[in-house]
């Protein structure tokens, strides 16, 4: 190969041309690659931030769920206590009502007994008066002593 040969100079020119083109293009390519690297890094940082935010949100949600479960248990316990108290109060009221009705019923029975006893006494007294009247009318002898009258009356009964 000779230095004056055109293919040699063509090759040298091509190498110089490629070098001259590559040099500014190298800066543009490197700048573009650097921008892509920065963009990827930003995306990775955003993804990590989103991941951390999601993890924090998940932990907060779990904490809220635990709080709600504790609140639910507390409310259930309070409701059971209130229900038990109401049941006891109503049971006591019913027992007092039944006791009151029992006392009223006993008083009513006693008053009915007294009324029946009085009616029987009145009937008995009326019957005795009737028997004594009949006896006096039938004997027409009013000269008897009280003991004789009682004896005769008892014999008739």
Swiss-Prot record:
One GO CC annotation: plasma membrane
InterPro entries per record: ATP_synth_b/b'su_bac/chlpt
Chain segments annotated as transmembrane: 1-21
Keyword vocabulary terms for this entry: ATP synthesis, Cell inner membrane, Cell membrane, CF(0), Hydrogen ion transport, Ion transport, Membrane, Transmembrane, Transmembrane helix, Transport
Annotated membrane topology: Single-pass membrane protein
GO molecular function, one term: proton-transporting ATP synthase activity, rotational mechanism
Domain of life from the UniProt record: Bacteria
Subcellular localization(s) per the UniProt record: Cell inner membrane
Keyword Transmembrane part of the UniProt annotation: yes
Subunit structure, interactors included: F-type ATPases have 2 components, F(1) - the catalytic core - and F(0) - the membrane proton channel. F(1) has five subunits: alpha(3), beta(3), gamma(1), delta(1), epsilon(1). F(0) has three main subunits: a(1), b(2) and c(10-14). The alpha and beta chains form an alternating ring which encloses part of the gamma chain. F(1) is attached to F(0) by a central stalk formed by the gamma and epsilon chains, while a peripheral stalk is formed by the delta and b chains.
Known role: F(1)F(0) ATP synthase produces ATP from ADP in the presence of a proton or sodium gradient. F-type ATPases consist of two structural domains, F(1) containing the extramembraneous catalytic core and F(0) containing the membrane proton channel, linked together by a central stalk and a peripheral stalk. During catalysis, ATP synthesis in the catalytic domain of F(1) is coupled via a rotary mechanism of the central stalk subunits to proton translocation.
HAMAP family on file: ATP_synth_b_bprime
Family that this chain belongs to: Belongs to the ATPase B chain family.
Name of the protein described by the UniProt record: ATP synthase subunit b
Gene behind this protein: atpF
């Amino acid at each position: 190969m000779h230095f004056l040969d055109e293919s040699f100079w063509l090759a040298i020119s091509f190498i110089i041309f490629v070098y001259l083109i590559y040099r500014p293009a190298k800066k543009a390519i490197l700048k573009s690659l650097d921008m892509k690297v920065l963009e990827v890094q930003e995306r990775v940082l955003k993804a990590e931030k989103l991941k951390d935010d999601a993890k924090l949100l998940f932990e907060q949600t779990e904490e809220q769920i635990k709080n709600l479960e504790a609140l639910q248990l507390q409310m259930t316990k309070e409701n059971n206590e209130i229900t038990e108290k109401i049941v006891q109060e109503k049971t006591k009221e019913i027992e007092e009502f039944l006791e009151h009705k029992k006392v009223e019923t006993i008083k009513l029975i006693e008053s009915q007994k007294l009324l029946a006893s009085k009616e029987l006494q009145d009937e008995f007294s009326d019957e005795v008066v009737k028997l004594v009247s009949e006896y006096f009318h039938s004997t027409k002898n009013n000269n008897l002593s009280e003991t004789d009258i009682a004896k005769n009356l008892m014999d008739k009964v």
